[in-house]
């Protein structure tokens, strides 16, 4: 007996027009801001962008230009956009490298290690995930200042190398691995680290891809934390750098829009690269759950 929730053979869709219109409206609501952002980034006049905002003219450009994208690289010596972009890439790569390693190691130990109080630790992690990050910003900032790590890459990377959410996601995947696979590796003389590195990680690519996407987007979009821990352009990421286009006397809408498009592009590329694994992981988790 089929368990497919879609339309079964012999049945017809009773409301095809309603479904089509609903999907079209939802898609339009989602895509419209992105389209508006791209169109505004192609307009040469920042005053035109502000004047047309809120009207249908905002979704059309008569004389498109890529000059805005060139201008953000040479906007001002006080706003080195190219440096901000490089900083964001460095922070992203360091965070992904450490986050994927430490979160997966912790998940493996919780799933297969002989750890006393494992249930209590899992409960504590879920509780910590519920706590808003904003509530621990000031204590964490104080720790970074006392360690002398503020205004650098370390302060923007180290706090995100461990996350209750990602440990729990990977724990769920690791705990579903058949016991026979683990026992076979033990019989072959593999150490716990070798089992983790050579057996579990290769078969966990869908789950790791999911964590990489979520962690990458979270890191790339960080604003409050880097705003608090950075004082110089040397380590400031692109999310904070864009705020420099909004001055007290004037707002460079054209440059801000172009910079926002540049900031948005890597997130889309990251998802497209890992899209297959991400979808497979979600489906697999749903079936196992």
State each model region's role.
Residues 1-5:
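Short, intrinsically disordered terminal tails adjacent to the first/last structured region
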Residues 7-11, 15-289:
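A structural signal for multi-pass alpha-helical bundles of membrane permease subunits
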């Amino acid at each position: 007996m089929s368990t497919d929730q879609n339309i079964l053979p012999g049945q017809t869709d009773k409301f095809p027009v309603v479904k089509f219109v609903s999907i079209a409206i939802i898609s339009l609501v989602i895509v419209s801001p992105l389209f508006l952002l791209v169109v505004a980034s192609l307009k040469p006049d920042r005053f035109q962008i502000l004047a047309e905002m809120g009207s249908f003219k905002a979704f059309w450009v008569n004389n498109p230009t890529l000059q805005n994208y060139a201008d953000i690289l040479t906007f001002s010596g006080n706003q080195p956009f190219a440096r901000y972009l490089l900083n964001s890439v460095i922070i992203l790569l360091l965070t992904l490298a450490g986050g994927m390693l430490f979160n997966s190691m912790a998940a493996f130990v919780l799933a297969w290690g002989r750890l006393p109080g494992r249930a209590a630790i899992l409960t504590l992690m879920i509780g910590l995930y519920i706590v808003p990050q904003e509530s621990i910003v000031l204590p964490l900032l104080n720790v970074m200042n006392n360690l002398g790590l503020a205004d650098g890459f370390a302060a923007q990377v180290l706090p995100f190398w461990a996350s209750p959410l990602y440990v729990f996601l990977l724990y769920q995947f690791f705990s579903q691995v058949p016991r026979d696979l683990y026992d076979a590796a033990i019989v072959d003389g593999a150490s716990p680290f070798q089992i983790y590195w050579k057996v579990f990680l290769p078969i966990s690519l869908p789950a790791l891809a999911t964590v990489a996407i979520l962690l990458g987007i979270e890191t790339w979009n960080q604003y409050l934390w880097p705003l608090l821990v950075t004082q110089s352009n040397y380590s400031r990421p692109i999310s904070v750098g864009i705020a420099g286009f909004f001055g007290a006397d004037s707002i460079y809408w054209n440059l801000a829009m172009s910079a926002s498009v540049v900031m948005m592009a890597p997130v889309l590329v990251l998802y497209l690269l890992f899209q297959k694994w991400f979808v497979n992981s979600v489906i697999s988790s749903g079936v196992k759950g």
